[in-house]
């Protein structure tokens, strides 16, 4: 079979053009990891381009991709410098109160028949932050009937035993995290809480005139739980979604990220269906609670509550988790190839 010089030249020209185009495409095609990171960062912007979730995007979209490996041995536990670590407790809404530090939150939902507490700080913090904080707010710690522990890391479950033993509060936690508590060797220097209420998906905790709907969202820990409930702002009802666990400080492999991402997407749908306009959690640097609540003293009539960010912003919070989680997942896949 004869191939004319023209045909050969044309074929070579087409090959050269195609190769050049392919190379150009390779050079200009967006990096999928960076695309997800960019989408996560873009989702952090709030009203007037104010980055209302800057702390969240910094923690999970920047640090995880660049952070050094964790040391084999954990740092020793230390009683914190209370003068700098503990913040004044605040009345956040008509019936929701905040206590905590610049990085950790405990929330108290008041009802007709007592208090539902969300998360309990660390072992060394609970007495001062929770017991002392409730008293400063004019609330009685003995009226805490339920403690919902979003996940069993030491800075959320540390005060559960105190509330259980001293005040008889019922402790609610996911099954996987009760197992974590039971199996812990040295995570509870003052003793562990006794296994109590095991959270199930869709469970409702009702006290007086309030109900908290609980949802399983494994990922951050095996038994992480989130919640949906109602509060009031100057008499106006608002729906709150409580994000139970955010950071990627679990085993960094693809299956764990698949679990995390599935939970984020499910819980985002639950929040949207509930019409939630307030998103809070146990890490005050992620929802901005510690800073935002300081502005309440200067809030003017008709001005929006700093934590009532709107349904679109609540969706953006979950988008940050989703996009940044996908970025790290893709990086893990690339490393395994």
Regions found by a protein language model. Name each.
Residues 82-137, 141, 226-247:
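Conserved beta-strand hairpin/beta-sheet module of binuclear metal-dependent hydrolase folds
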Residues 19-23:
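Sec/Tat signal peptide C-region and signal peptidase I cleavage site
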Residues 95, 109, 119, 151, ...:
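Divalent metal-coordination and catalytic microenvironments
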Residues 26-47, 124-128, 132-204, 297-299, ...:
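Active-site HxH/HxHxD metal-binding segment of metal-dependent hydrolases
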